[in-house]
């Protein structure tokens, strides 16, 4: 292939056109590899076109005006024809640089070619539909305000129009007027050259805000026009930049950054007042006020009420508490058995050195639930000696089914006496309680706090704290409505976080636990333990034995809650004034005790019915017992228990049910099974606790070493020499290399060396650094650490 080297350098290489690059560019390729390479003639033509466009833009009559705008046809001037031909030749270059340009010459095809007749006919086809381009009227906005017209004239006379016209996208062009732009502020800044916009904004912040009166449009326009008369070229450009910058770079302020007690007008800037109200606001579910906090309220919980500095940013504000829960579920989980590294009998792995993931997450959830607080609640600050009330009731219906005519709500609260968490149940109305007589047996209920299957009762009282004034959502601000509930009855119990009732666990929960016979025997044993202890104190549960009042704390452990409420609510003045003898009291207690036994049988029967299909869960007790005997695998012993506990003759005199005989005959053998489970659970918990036994000791040792090393530059020369040994030991402690030469996390090395250091044994160890190595015992290292730590404290 013959190539002319002189002309090849002006020819674009085909590899650039096809592939975008040429791999022979630096290896002897004779063609050009520059896409923007143009000939001198093309450069001259391009420069001439740019000069003509610049003259047209400045409003002058250039020689190069297209011929189609002067003379239509072949009689155009020679200058116009030359310009038109040059524009057609360089149409591709100009199109690549200016894709959309309103100032480009109008394209007019030549009529002296072979297809000129067709083009002429096509042009004449639409000649009657629209006027000529040169006769088209200039577009002017209909609703253009006098302010924008005045600004256009100012910009045209000041020479800023040519500067702004060279920019493609500029908010300061004459045809653009930002919404809500206040030119009166620009006039004030222009009259005071030494002042700036932030200073004026600060003055406006100090002035008390008055209700804004609607201003007349004409008066407002006159004020703005008077302000524009004092603007010159330099002040106009400076003021536009000063006033437009806060609109663009205004920092976002959360909705709850201003406490309710602070004045709302102190943080509102002037430009924010002028903004339209249809501004985009963040979603309500992303604002911090709608998120439940995971930390207790403290002095640092609330955001600062100080004005935000003009320098931008909120760095100087005090850090607030974390608004999101702990990410305890992000721990590395244990691998499945098929992926676990096989270990020998005498070997162990890091998973066995710490708590299991399930137990750790369960404890984290309980701690998180204990520390949860809720903001902006219309609840009293203090109820008797308790504060920080948080509703924890999962039911949206406050009306009680156990105590008809009453509404009940459950709260979590803190005690002023010991600082512990308690569960406070509010019951209202309680207008029938007029003195302390209904609370005469509360001391007996408090004495049952040692029973493992009863939620301990701590306090009972009536209060007017919930009947204080509260704001009505339909009333205007400041109007208050007096609560009509009157006094409220409150019972305080021990608090168990993240608990569930048996109704939620087995019947109406999201993930119900299936019922088994072993589980039923366990529930029966624990309920009998609680009922027997209550009856031994000459007390009765009455209507408290219900699936919604039996809570599940851990695994299969249950507790009776709500004890003592039915007794207080069922008390009446007639009972207190009635003179009844001991025989009547014994007969009444026997009747109440029989009611408790029947309620216990109903609870077990309701749980046993969950083993049957829906069509076999009859309402009659006798039919349900037959279906359980025919359609389930329950043992005959448990069916006999259900038969005894649901016998209608229990509610008939002489109320001959004997609890001790029932325990010996039916439940004694299952007490051993329950005790075996409890002992195994106790041993497992103790084993898991032993894995965390040494964590505190080793953590204190590592903390002591880090404190000593952090103060290394402040010691003298002798101390630095001793400190150098400690630093080398720390580096060797966490510097483990695997067989492939890469660093590994050797947990065994860290634990073994820290335990040896804590004991101070005489074993020698080799410490290696970049420049030296030393042999020293753990006892000497421990003495150095203790000495340096005493110097640090002294």
UniProtKB/Swiss-Prot annotation:
One of its GO terms (molecular function) is protein kinase activity. Keywords: ATP-binding, Coiled coil, Cytoplasm, Metal-binding, mRNA processing, Nucleotide-binding, Zinc, Zinc-finger. One of its GO terms (biological process) is nuclear-transcribed mRNA poly(A) tail shortening. A zinc finger (C3H1-type) spans 7-36. It is found in: Cytoplasm. Residues 372-668 are annotated as: Pseudokinase domain. It holds the Pfam family Pan3_PK. Residues 200-226 have a biased composition (Low complexity). It comes from the Eukaryota. SMART domains: S_TKc. The keyword Zinc applies. SUPFAM superfamilies: Protein kinase-like (PK-like). Residues 40-97, 187-226 are annotated as: Disordered. Homodimer. Forms a heterotrimer with a catalytic subunit PAN2 to form the poly(A)-nuclease (PAN) deadenylation complex. Interacts (via PAM-2 motif) with poly(A)-binding protein PAB1 (via PABC domain), conferring substrate specificity of the enzyme complex. This is PAN2-PAN3 deadenylation complex subunit PAN3. The gene is PAN3.
């Amino acid at each position: 292939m013959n190539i002319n080297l002189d002309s090849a350098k002006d020819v674009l290489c085909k590899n650039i056109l096809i592939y975008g690059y040429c791999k022979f560019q630096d290896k002897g390729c004779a063609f050009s590899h520059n896409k923007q390479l143009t000939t001198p003639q093309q450069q001259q033509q391009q420069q001439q076109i740019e000069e003509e466009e610049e003259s047209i833009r400045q409003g002058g009559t250039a020689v190069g005006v297209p011929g189609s705008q002067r003379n239509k046809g072949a009689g155009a001037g020679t200058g116009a024809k030359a310009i038109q031909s040059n524009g057609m030749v360089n149409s591709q270059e100009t199109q690549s640089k200016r894709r959309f340009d309103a100032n480009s010459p109008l394209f007019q095809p030549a009529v002296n070619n072979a297809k000129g007749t067709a083009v002429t006919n096509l042009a004449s086809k639409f000649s009657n539909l629209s006027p000529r381009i040169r006769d088209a009227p200039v577009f002017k906005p209909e609703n253009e305000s006098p302010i924008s017209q005045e600004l256009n004239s100012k910009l045209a006379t000041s020479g800023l129009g040519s500067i702004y016209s060279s920019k493609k996208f500029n908010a300061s062009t004459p045809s653009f007027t930002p919404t809500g732009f206040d030119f009166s502020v620009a006039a004030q800044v222009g009259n005071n050259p030494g002042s700036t916009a932030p200073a004026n904004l600060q003055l406006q912040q100090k002035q008390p805000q008055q209700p804004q009166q609607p201003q007349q449009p004409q008066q407002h326009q006159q004020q703005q026009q008077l302000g524009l008369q004092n603007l010159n070229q330099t002040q106009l450009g400076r003021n536009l930049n000063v006033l437009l910058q806060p609109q663009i770079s205004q920092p976002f302020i959360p909705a709850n950054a201003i406490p309710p007690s602070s004045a709302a007008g102190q943080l509102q800037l002037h430009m924010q007042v002028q903004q339209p109200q249809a501004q985009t606001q963040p979603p309500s579910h992303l604002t911090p006020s709608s998120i439940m906090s995971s930390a207790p309220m403290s002095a640092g919980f609330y955001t600062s009420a100080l004005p935000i500095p003009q320098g931008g940013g909120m760095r100087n504000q005090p850090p607030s508490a974390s608004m999101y829960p702990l990410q305890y579920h992000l721990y590395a989980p244990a691998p499945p058995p098929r992926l676990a590294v096989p270990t020998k009998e005498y070997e162990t792995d890091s998973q066995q050195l710490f708590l299991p993931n399930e137990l750790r997450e369960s404890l984290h959830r309980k701690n998180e639930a204990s520390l949860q607080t809720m903001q902006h609640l219309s609840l009293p600050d203090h109820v008797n000696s308790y504060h920080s009330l948080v509703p924890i009731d999962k039911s949206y219906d406050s009306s009680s089914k156990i105590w008809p005519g009453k509404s009940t709500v459950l709260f979590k609260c803190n005690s002023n006496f010991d600082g512990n968490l308690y569960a406070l149940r509010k019951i209202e109305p309680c207008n029938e309680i007029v003195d302390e007589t209904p609370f005469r047996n509360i001391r007996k209920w408090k004495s049952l706090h040692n029973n493992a299957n009863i939620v301990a009762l701590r306090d009972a009282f009536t209060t007017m704290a919930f009947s204080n004034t509260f704001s009505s959502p339909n009333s205007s601000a400041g109007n208050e409505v007096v609560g009509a509930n009157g006094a409220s009855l409150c019972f305080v119990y021990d608090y168990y976080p993240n608990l569930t009732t048996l109704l939620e666990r087995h019947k109406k929960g999201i993930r119900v636990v299936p019922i088994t016979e072993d589980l039923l025997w366990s529930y029966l044993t624990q309920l009998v333990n609680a009922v027997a202890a209550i009856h031994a104190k000459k007390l009765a549960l009455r209507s408290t034995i219900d699936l919604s009042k039996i809570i599940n704390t851990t695994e299969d452990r249950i507790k009776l809650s709500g004890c003592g409420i039915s007794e207080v609510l069922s008390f009446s003045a007639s009972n207190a004034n009635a003179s009844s003898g001991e025989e009547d009291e014994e007969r009444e207690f026997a009747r109440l005790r029989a009611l408790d036994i029947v309620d216990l049988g109903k609870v077990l029967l309701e749980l046993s019915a969950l083993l049957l299909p829906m069509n076999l869960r009859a309402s009659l007790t006798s039919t349900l017992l037959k279906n359980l005997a025919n359609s389930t695998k329950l043992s005959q012993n448990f069916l006999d228990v259900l038969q005894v506990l649901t016998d209608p003759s229990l509610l008939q005199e002489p109320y001959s049910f004997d609890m001790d005989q029932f325990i010996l005959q039916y439940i004694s053998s299952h007490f051993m099974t329950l005790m075996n489970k409890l002992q195994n659970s106790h041993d497992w918990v103790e084993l898991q606790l032993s894995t965390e036994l040494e964590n505190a000791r080793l953590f204190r040792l590592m903390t002591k070493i880090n404190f000593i090393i952090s103060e290394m530059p402040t010691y003298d020369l002798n101390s630095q020499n001793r400190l150098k040994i400690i630093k080398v030991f720390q580096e060797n402690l966490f510097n483990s290399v695997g067989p492939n030469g890469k660093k590994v996390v050797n947990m065994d090395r860290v634990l073994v060396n820290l335990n040896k250091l804590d004991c101070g044994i005489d074993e020698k160890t080799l410490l290696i650094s970049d420049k030296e190595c030393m042999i020293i015992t753990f006892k000497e290292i421990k003495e150095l650490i203790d000495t340096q730590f005493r110097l640090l404290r002294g």
